Amino acid sequence: MANTKYYPEVSSNANFAAIEREILKFWQDNNIFQKSIDGRNGESEFIFYDGPPFANGLPHYGHLLTGFIKDVYARYQTVKGKKVERRFGWDCHGLPAEMQSEKELGISGRLAITNFGIEKFNAHCRASVMEYASDWEEYVTRQARWVDFKNSYKTMDKNFMESVLWAFKELYNKGLLCESMRVVPYSWACETPLSNFETRLDNSYRERSDKAVTVSFVLRDKLHEIPAFAGMISRESEMTVGGDYQEYRILTWTTTPWTLPSNLAIAVGSDIDYALVPQENICYIIAASSVSKYAKELGLSGEENFEIIKGSQLQGLRYKPLFDYFEHHPNSFKIFDVDFVVEGDGTGVVHMAPGFGEDDQILCESKGISLVCPVDNSGKFTKEIPDLEGVQVFDANDKIIIKLKEQGNWLKTEQYIHNYPHCWRTDTPLIYKAVPSWYVKVTQFKDRMVELNQQINWIPHHVKDNLFGKWLENARDWSISRNRFWGTPLPVWKSDDPKYPRIDVYGSIEELEKDFGVKVTDLHRPFIDKLTRPNPNDPTGKSTMRRIEDVFDCWFESGSMPYGQAHYPFENKEWFEDHFPADFIVEYSAQTRGWFYTLMVLSTALFDRPPFLNCICHGVILDATGQKLSKRLNNYADPLELFDQYGSDALRVTMLSSNIVKGQELLIDKDGKMVFDTLRLFIKPIWSSYHFFTMYANADSLKGEISFASENVLDVYILSKLKIAVSKIEESLDNFDTQTAYHAVLEFFEVLNNWYIRRSRARFWKSEKDTDKQNAYNTLYSCLKTMAIAMSALVPMISEAIYKGLCHCEETSTLSSRDLIAGSSKSINNLNPVVKPRDYTPSVHHNDQISVHLCNYPTLSDFEINHELVATMDNVLDICSNSLFIRSTKNIRVRQPLASITIISKHNNDLKAFENLIKDEINVKSVIYCDDLENYASKKLSINFPMLGKRLPAKMKEIIAASKKGDWKAIAGGLTICGETLNNEEYKLILEPYSHIKGAASFENNSSLLILDLELTAELIEEGYARDIVRFIQQARKDAGFSITDRILIEIISEFDLSEIIYNYGDFITEQTLGEFSKNFTPDYVSKVELEDHPIQLKIKKS
């Protein structure tokens, strides 16, 4: 009669991609995601905001990384008993959609769009923005991320847009909006301004080489004729160089020659020293520190002495404009001393073009100089510069330089390499240009944002006061209007007659319908533009209220996501107030200038609250050489192919166990080796323990039960380690630290596989089904089932497969041959999936859930950790692992016995209880105990230079010297050196054996030492051979396909004399292999091996 098998038969070489496909189908067929939400009563919720991506392109690795993090914490909080709604969202408006549509329609520029028709253009945008929505759903689903796609919000939905209108009017009513003409970063390729924070996104600064030009402006005023200079410049000093200067010229340097036609002022540094450099009848004015750079151009030998003046003495001097375009502009063409001009590059003199520089505009406005901006929306000169009309500004540089040479104002041209901002959509260089725009007056409440930021837990922590905190401290007013087409229109109507000014701002569809008397079904352009009405302030009745053409910056919409998704305040008011702020959000670190920032601005201005309480800023993924992942470079694999080869759990672990979750970079290779290594080193060890349990439990027809009652020392130890791991995972995920959580999982399974299972093999293998054997199965079952729940958020599909196999095997279906073929063809190892044995009886417990993701997080509250046992057994493990490492470095195989190990420790009495275990594990004959550590080793101080160097940079030389001399003293909780107290993270004490001690290693945090006796006697060598023979026979049994319980006949044929070995160790060999030596039988299997380079033929047969 066949054995009853309670668990599925699983391969040790499983096809994890095929298993994952089965799990995805199981989730879908059984509606597990929805059950995970419905199963929580909502009294305790975890509020999660899902930042909306654009759907006009496929997801990339950055999206997958963010999605993995989002999914981990949503799943974790669910098993912790909280209700976690996960509504997906889509960014639909803005430049990404417009640029894509222009490309698809074959048009470019505002004029072309207007001629094409705004209605048709926006209709195309509407259709195209969701082009890849189904692909997104495929990717997101395949990565095992649970989100609600059916109820997703879209920023182009009327309800969402209406909430945006409400927010705008609220800001307007609070006095936090203004319309202003300001210099802002401007994309001439997109014909729209950008926010200052958009120039900080996605590494938008690029290295660029520009022509820098030095030009001379002729002063209208001669210095020696000005009373202020009379006592400083003597007539005699002038006469020594040829008499009165005919001209004074001030030298300026700029990397944007195209702005020179718009020059209206010059700025010098108040406290900078300027030299008066004579050349024939001309006296040049230049920063004294820059004179040497222009020696050639000014004809200097380097030996000259010059008169020096302060920049403040140049204040108010007049100069002649370079060009006559704006020569009559009021209050212009004067020198002003300021504090923002610095020495360094250039001449220490800055030309001011208030239409193209923020500082320029501020200075000129303060001096009563209005700006000029002779550049149109496409970055081309207007008719105000007639000889350059229609020329793109960057193409005009050479023409301007030629003209300067002709006029005699040119001095020098050089190539200047610098980091320059580029458009984040078109990658074209930006210009800074004065444009009319609506602004959120961020500067009025930025101090409050800084205060509210202190309520947010940032991961990594330094983001709070550095990356994000500094950005808030220096926040500027936010330009939120864009002169584009596809976006939420600004709800501002103005009178078309300046004689009768009026501005109306609308915050709801109801207000619009009331004033304009029409039903509003679409808030987009051009429909909203058609809403006009007579100006109530015009008694003549001739003027009309018309909407301004601008639409919102799409970042305003992203920042409106918390209330926009709920159509607040028009609906769901109570829901929103209960779901704001979010408990958690996550994006990559550049979003401190993007989504995180816009959320913070609007949340502070509208609600005086932080928008979220916990935020992870992860790093970026690069290729193996450190380059950005790019289709053009073809330097990354399709994620779906990676999933089909290794499974998505492996990619999840690869990413979330790395430093990228702490804001650092992750380099990932195109061939997937890193993911394969994760599969090999993380996923497979977990599966191996599960495979071991099912294989032997089925062989013994035994069921495991959740039990913590065993008193076996190995059981108590592993169950204690289990509770420690479960607690560590919980603590780590509570602190938003996946890296530590994954380490806790890996560390536990290393101990489970390499210690508990290996040291308990005899208990599983023995034929008696006694209490000890059942305890071993119960303990292993308890570990696997408990860890499946604890790590379910970290490896959701492998956890589900293990949990179902242990608890709900009746629902584990056999994979179809089609699945097997598909999986095998894409798998590097032709791996096998989970299959169900024919004589299979499911093991179901009354308190089991249908899915691991419907369980509650394990507490193990009834089990007390045996801390003393854990500490001692950890030391035993440390001793054994170090001993095996020494063997490895000395090329001494583990089967080769050694005479002894010497242990020098304060805890020898505790270790003696495990002496036999140590002897067996590391294969030594005896254990010698000592406590006189100083006779064997000394402690050396190792400094953590990066950490201590930041705190004590000036003392590092002295500390290094003292550490080498041993001039330090250990104290409670630290160490003193050179008058400084170091904490435990700033140093490490390393136990260093004396040079004559061989085979030594430290353990127990460098407080204890072990020494292996590496001398091999003839007797030890012979016993080693016997153990080799056992291994050869065991391998032959496995290769022959024998069962672990089959007894066998053995014959060994060799020219190498094995008689002494068989005589002395024959009983040991047969006992270990369930065999007996025999001759003259027909073997079932023959194996050929080598022992010390001697060929051996090994014959075995079932007896």
Curated annotation (Swiss-Prot):
GO molecular function, a single term: zinc ion binding
Family to which the UniProt record says this protein belongs: Belongs to the class-I aminoacyl-tRNA synthetase family. IleS type 2 subfamily.
Transmembrane region(s): none
First-level EC class: ligase
InterPro entries: aa-tRNA-synth_I_CS, aa-tRNA-synth_Ia, Anticodon_Ile_ABEc, Ile-tRNA-ligase, Ile-tRNA-ligase_type2, M/V/L/I-tRNA-synth_anticd-bd, Rossmann-like_a/b/a_fold, RPE4
Subunit structure: Monomer.
HAMAP family, per the entry: Ile_tRNA_synth_type2
Gene, per the UniProt record: ileS
Gene Ontology biological process terms, A to Z: isoleucyl-tRNA aminoacylation
Residue positions binding ATP: K631
Motif ('KMSKS' region): 628-632
Domain remark from Swiss-Prot or TrEMBL: IleRS has two distinct active sites: one for aminoacylation and one for editing. The misactivated valine is translocated from the active site to the editing site, which sterically excludes the correctly activated isoleucine. The single editing site contains two valyl binding pockets, one specific for each substrate (Val-AMP or Val-tRNA(Ile)).
Protein's recorded name: Isoleucine--tRNA ligase
Keyword entries, A-Z: Aminoacyl-tRNA synthetase, ATP-binding, Cytoplasm, Ligase, Metal-binding, Nucleotide-binding, Protein biosynthesis, Zinc
Entry-linked CDD domains: Anticodon_Ia_Ile_ABEc, IleRS_core
Biological role: Catalyzes the attachment of isoleucine to tRNA(Ile). As IleRS can inadvertently accommodate and process structurally similar amino acids such as valine, to avoid such errors it has two additional distinct tRNA(Ile)-dependent editing activities. One activity is designated as 'pretransfer' editing and involves the hydrolysis of activated Val-AMP. The other activity is designated 'posttransfer' editing and involves deacylation of mischarged Val-tRNA(Ile).
Entry annotated with the keyword Metal-binding: yes
Coarse class of the protein's main subcellular location: cytoplasm
Catalytic activity of the protein: tRNA(Ile) + L-isoleucine + ATP = L-isoleucyl-tRNA(Ile) + AMP + diphosphate
Cofactor(s) this protein requires: Zn(2+)
Position of sequence motif 'HIGH' region: 53-63
Subcellular location: Cytoplasm
